[in-house]
């Protein structure tokens, strides 16, 4: 079942590249948010450094 889901999300072409599928039309309004979501963990990493700088790297 997971493999069927993965096949709908990812399209593996003949040369092995991964092409991401588009969101369904009902969720098109969330497209800008989905584009930014992979960057959010980087913000948490940077926040950890800012926090440690604020407490003088104790």
UniProtKB/Swiss-Prot annotation:
Q: Which UniProt keywords apply?
A: Chloroplast, Membrane, Photosynthesis, Photosystem II, Plastid, Reaction center, Thylakoid, Transmembrane, Transmembrane helix
Q: Where are the transmembrane segments?
A: 29-49
Subcellular localization:
Plastid, Chloroplast thylakoid membrane
Q: A single GO CC term, please?
A: photosystem II reaction center
Q: Please indicate which superkingdom the organism of origin belongs to.
A: Eukaryota
Q: Which residues form the propeptide?
A: 1-21
Classification via InterPro entries: PSII_PsbK, PSII_PsbK_sf
Tell me its family.
Belongs to the PsbK family.
PANTHER family, per this entry? Answer: PHOTOSYSTEM II REACTION CENTER PROTEIN K, PTHR35325
Function description: One of the components of the core complex of photosystem II (PSII). PSII is a light-driven water:plastoquinone oxidoreductase that uses light energy to abstract electrons from H(2)O, generating O(2) and a proton gradient subsequently used for ATP formation. It consists of a core antenna complex that captures photons, and an electron transfer chain that converts photonic excitation into a charge separation.
Would you tell me the protein name for this molecule? Photosystem II reaction center protein K
**What is the species listed in this Swiss-Prot or TrEMBL entry?**
Staurastrum punctulatum
Its lineage reads: Eukaryota, Viridiplantae, Streptophyta, Zygnematophyceae, Zygnematophycidae
What is the primary gene name for this protein? Answer: psbK
């Amino acid at each position: 079942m997971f493999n069927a889901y993965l096949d709908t999300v990812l399209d593996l072409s003949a040369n092995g590249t991964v092409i991401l599928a588009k969101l369904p039309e009902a969720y098109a309004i969330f497209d800008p948010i989905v584009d930014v979501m992979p960057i959010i963990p980087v913000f948490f990493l940077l926040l950890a450094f800012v926090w440690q700088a604020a407490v003088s790297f104790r």
